[in-house]
């Protein structure tokens, strides 16, 4: 993304993928813009400006996770989505909350490595070409004559041209490539991720520097050598420093299902452990330093977006200290028939476009009539009201059921055009959507 995207531009970008929920989009757009604003502020004050964390409240399937995911993609920032229910209080068996930052650091290193390798790709391609040409046309030994070098240069240029045009792709060559580190998958007990990671990194260093001779096609060798040469050109220490800085300044953590760790006063049971997870989250959200294998990472400027349906609990059931760490609260609306219709037609990768593309591969042209789309939206909305409100995810079930027979026999219908109108939808779905017992199990 352009770093100078205004909040309205961010919202219009999110509109391409998520229907409605303008309040939530507005809140995350402002949060993202504030990061850029903070970078423009002078140093003593800049350190004092911390992100305002967001709490999204709304039923499942209305776009909470998708908003956070698209925002991270837009910002090109390290992003991690985790369920709050996965964590246990320190001292209990299970994952502790510090692993959130460690996982985010891993994500940032991977992201930064990809970005750095893209920058040196042109140089890496040239070096890979030269290594393949050295195998195809070994360079002459220097015996004091200038003439053979010219001939070799001409032959080399000819082969280089053929290589670039793909004429040598199927030719088999033998060359030396780096031997990968021995693959060791170590399963550690819950809560011992640090120790497991240290053992894994210890074994990862064993195979470094070793070379293997392998036979492979030129096309396969070229890809392998590009990665190898790019890895040589990338400075690992700088890369790790950039990744750590990226996590500290731009990291986004999406805490899903936060309502499931809220203590409900009328219920007894495992409330101690729930409150313990909330207390463990507190320093992380407020700002602390976490030790990772890439160095110490401060969480002061990481943006936390929490979400929950809050069916059985309320935001006020969270411990007061944690409530205070999420000053921006946004309620997301349930989806209406009009929203469902827009989801099916207006988003960039709508379900209708996906099914059209899938069936096109079999030679079937799928056409969705306006009345067919409205009927689908009405059925999805009706089943959500009668059975269980699972939001936009209901459309997956409805669409699969609608196109089940067509998808199964698509290879026999090649060259045909199938129109999905209201009559087609009613023929296949009206009995199911009308019968509450059937829709409970099928739709």
From Swiss-Prot:
Q: Which GO terms describe its cellular component?
A: HslUV protease complex
- Keywords per UniProt: ATP-binding, Chaperone, Cytoplasm, Nucleotide-binding, Stress response
According to its UniProt record, where is this protein located? Cytoplasm
Q: Which InterPro entries match?
A: AAA+_ATPase, ATP-dep_Clp_protease_ClpX, ATPase_AAA_core, Clp_ATPase_C, HslU, P-loop_NTPase
Q: Which GO terms describe its molecular function?
A: ATP binding; ATP hydrolysis activity; peptidase activity; proteasome-activating activity
Any idea which positions bind ATP?
19, 61-66, 256, 321, 393
**Where does the chain cross the membrane?**
none
Q: What processes does the entry annotate via GO biological process terms?
A: protein unfolding; proteolysis involved in protein catabolic process
| PANTHER family named among the record's database cross-references | ATP-DEPENDENT CLP PROTEASE ATP-BINDING SUBUNIT CLPX-LIKE, MITOCHONDRIAL-RELATED, ATP-DEPENDENT PROTEASE ATPASE SUBUNIT HSLU
NCBIfam families in the cross-refs: hslU, PRK05201.1
Q: How does it assemble?
A: A double ring-shaped homohexamer of HslV is capped on each side by a ring-shaped HslU homohexamer. The assembly of the HslU/HslV complex is dependent on binding of ATP.
As for family, the record states: Belongs to the ClpX chaperone family. HslU subfamily.
What is known about what this protein does?
Answer: ATPase subunit of a proteasome-like degradation complex; this subunit has chaperone activity. The binding of ATP and its subsequent hydrolysis by HslU are essential for unfolding of protein substrates subsequently hydrolyzed by HslV. HslU recognizes the N-terminal part of its protein substrates and unfolds these before they are guided to HslV for hydrolysis.
Q: What is this protein's name?
A: ATP-dependent protease ATPase subunit HslU
List the source organism.
Ralstonia pickettii (strain 12J)
Q: Which gene name does the record give?
A: hslU
């Amino acid at each position: 993304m352009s770093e100078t995207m205004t909040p309205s531009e961010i919202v219009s970008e999110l509109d391409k993928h998520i229907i409605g929920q303008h309040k939530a989009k507005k809140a995350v757009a402002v949060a993202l813009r504030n990061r850029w604003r903070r970078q423009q502020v002078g140093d003593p004050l800049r350190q004092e400006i911390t992100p305002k964390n967001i709490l999204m409240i709304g039923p499942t399937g209305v776009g909470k996770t998708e908003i956070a995911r698209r925002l991270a993609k837009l910002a090109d920032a390290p992003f991690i989505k985790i369920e709050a229910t996965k964590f246990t209080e320190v001292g209990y068996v299970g994952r502790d909350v510090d692993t959130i930052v460690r996982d985010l650091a891993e994500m940032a290193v991977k992201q930064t490595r990809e970005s750095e390798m893209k920058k040196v790709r042109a140089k890496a391609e040239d070096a890979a070409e030269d290594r393949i040409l050295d195998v195809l046309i070994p360079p002459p030994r220097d015996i004091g004559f200038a003439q053979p070098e010219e001939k070799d240069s001409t032959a080399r240029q000819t082969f280089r041209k053929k290589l670039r045009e793909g004429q040598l792709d199927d030719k088999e060559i033998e060359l030396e490539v780096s031997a990968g580190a021995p693959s060791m998958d170590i399963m550690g007990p819950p809560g011992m991720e640090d120790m497991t990671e240290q053992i894994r990194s210890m074994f990862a260093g064993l195979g470094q520097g070793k070379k293997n001779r392998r036979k492979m096609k030129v096309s396969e060798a070229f890809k392998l050598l590009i990665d190898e040469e790019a890895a040589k050109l990338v400075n690992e220490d700088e890369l790790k420093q950039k990744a750590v800085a990226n996590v500290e300044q731009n990291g986004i953590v999406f805490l899903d299902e936060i309502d499931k760790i809220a203590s409900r006063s009328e219920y007894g049971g495992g409330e101690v452990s729930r409150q313990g997870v909330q207390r463990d989250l507190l320093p992380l959200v407020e700002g602390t330093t976490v030790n990772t294998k890439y160095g110490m990472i401060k969480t002061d400027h990481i943006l936390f977006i929490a979400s929950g349906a809050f069916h059985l609990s309320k935001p006020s059931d969270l411990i007061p200290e944690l409530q205070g760490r999420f000053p921006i609260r946004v309620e997301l609306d349930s989806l209406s028939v009009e929203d469902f219709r827009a989801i099916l037609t207006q988003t960039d990768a709508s379900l209708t476009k996906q099914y059209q593309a899938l069936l096109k591969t079999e030679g079937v042209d799928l056409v969705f009539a306006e009345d067919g789309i409205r009927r689908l939206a009405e059925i999805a909305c009706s089943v959500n009201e009668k059975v269980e409100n699972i939001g936009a995810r209901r459309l997956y079930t409805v669409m699969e059921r609608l196109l089940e027979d067509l998808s199964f026999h698509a290879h026999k219908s090649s060259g045909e055009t199938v129109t999905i109108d209201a009559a087609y939808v009613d023929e296949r779905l009206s009995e199911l959507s009308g019968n509450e017992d059937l829709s409970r199990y099928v739709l």
